[in-house]
Amino acid sequence: MSGASLLKETGPREVFCGLTSIVWLHRRMPDAFFLVVGSRTCAHLIQSAAGVMIFAEPRFGTAILEERDLAGLADAHEELDRVVKNLLTRRPEIRTLFLVGSCPSEVIKIDLARAAERLNSQFNGKVTILNYSGSGIETTFTQGEDGALKAFVPLMPSSDKKQLLLVGTLANAVEDRLITIFKRLGIENVDSFPPRQSTELPSIGPETKVLLTQPYLTDTARVLKDRGAEILPAPFPLGVEGSRLWIEAAAKSFNVDQSLVTSTLEPLILRARKALKPYIEKLTGKKLFLLPESQLEIPLARFLHMECGMELLEIGTPYLNRDMMKPELDLLPDKTRIVEGQHVEKQLDRVRKNQPDLVVCGMGLANPLEAEGFSTKWSIEMVFSPIHGIDQASDLAELFSRPLHRHDLLNTKQLTST
């Protein structure tokens, strides 16, 4: 680890739950359906986050736990079987059904793993039924994707072919560009996970080299490693430098000549740095405080410091996997304060004490902090925005310059009016 100082905190948290990941997963795999076993609050959360009206028949829904279920007066498993049968009768195009656990279903101990096994035997291969937890009791919102991908891994076919596997949901256009770069480097067998169709799972084996695109896929990385795959250590593909090092990690693993890597990436890097310039001018010297929510905080901090010149006051992260994050930690400046976990009141006190120019935080904290005069950026925006890769570096920087620009405009307007 670099010279960063690490502090652990426990206490009250302010994060979304893992159900939120359904929003981007259901868009990624249009032949899959996500059935949350939860409360009306769970249903409202997903519908609001996705911005989809329920009459549009989205590829997610909620099996509502009523008071009778919570009190143990009804057989929740019988009710779940009935809901699933009705759903699959009405939506025969569903190829994969995820039963997604929630806080209520976990509190009353509904065994969704057993339910999935039972329903798989009933439907006899017509649809694949998997389960994972989206509960927020012990996890944060991005870990929903980790749970979903981990559930897929046992179904992935075995293969001995040498291949590169990109793991983690990316915007389709971004993924296509990255695959094109790898093919220019002579890496022909490139696949992605999750796939764009849930039935088209990539193969896995001892000749599979894995590049993680997201830092929150700890469990998925572990089970892929158990299947024989090699996880390539690299920073995550955020910003010019992170993306370059990420691509070079794959190139080195496939014995690609460094001169080819340089000639392929150099035009992209020059263009990206030119596009970054106006945002660097806005961000350089500004003080940054990241509250924990998405697990993207450390790669984002590295990008904003190394490439945009921001001063890092504190990096909060819900969980810190030191092995997975070592390439990122090694790039941070000495004495960077990293806080794993959260005691939200103590962290807010430190925000007020340090007076940052920009706070990256969850939606629930943004408005109160704005009311206190701080500029904020929602961390959830980083998950829904196409920010990965060299070409996207300026778009990523723009996301952080916007609130500062807005703050300047508001101050100018107030001065003019007075």
Swiss-Prot record:
One GO molecular-function annotation for this sequence?
ATP binding
Record flagged with keyword Metal-binding: yes
Highest taxon of the source?
Answer: Bacteria
The EC number of this protein is: 1.3.7.7
Q: If you read the UniProt record, what top EC class would you report for this enzyme, in one word? A: oxidoreductase
Q: Where does this protein act, in terms of pathway?
A: Porphyrin-containing compound metabolism; chlorophyll biosynthesis (light-independent)
- Could you tell me what reaction this enzyme catalyses? chlorophyllide a + oxidized 2[4Fe-4S]-[ferredoxin] + 2 ADP + 2 phosphate = protochlorophyllide a + reduced 2[4Fe-4S]-[ferredoxin] + 2 ATP + 2 H2O
How is its cofactor bound, per UniProt?
Binds 1 [4Fe-4S] cluster per heterodimer. The cluster is bound at the heterodimer interface by residues from both subunits.
Q: Which cofactor does it need?
A: [4Fe-4S] cluster
Q: Which InterPro entries match?
A: LIPOR_BchN/ChlN (IPR050293), Nase/OxRdtase_comp1 (IPR000510), Protochl_reductN (IPR005970)
What SUPFAM superfamilies does the record point to? Helical backbone' metal receptor (SSF53807)
One of the GO biological process terms? photosynthesis, dark reaction
- Residues annotated as binding [4Fe-4S] cluster: C17, C42, C103
Protein keywords: 4Fe-4S, ATP-binding, Chlorophyll biosynthesis, Iron, Iron-sulfur, Metal-binding, Nucleotide-binding, Oxidoreductase, Photosynthesis
> Which family does the record assign?
Belongs to the BchN/ChlN family.
Q: Which PANTHER family match?
A: LIGHT-INDEPENDENT PROTOCHLOROPHYLLIDE REDUCTASE SUBUNIT N
Oligomer status and interactors = Protochlorophyllide reductase is composed of three subunits; ChlL, ChlN and ChlB. Forms a heterotetramer of two ChlB and two ChlN subunits.
Which NCBIfam families does this chain map to?
Answer: DPOR_bchN (TIGR01279), PRK02842.1 (NF002768)
- Please give the function described in this protein's UniProt entry: Component of the dark-operative protochlorophyllide reductase (DPOR) that uses Mg-ATP and reduced ferredoxin to reduce ring D of protochlorophyllide (Pchlide) to form chlorophyllide a (Chlide). This reaction is light-independent. The NB-protein (ChlN-ChlB) is the catalytic component of the complex.
Protein name, please?
Answer: Light-independent protochlorophyllide reductase subunit N
**What organism, scientifically named, is this protein from?**
Prochlorococcus marinus (strain MIT 9211)
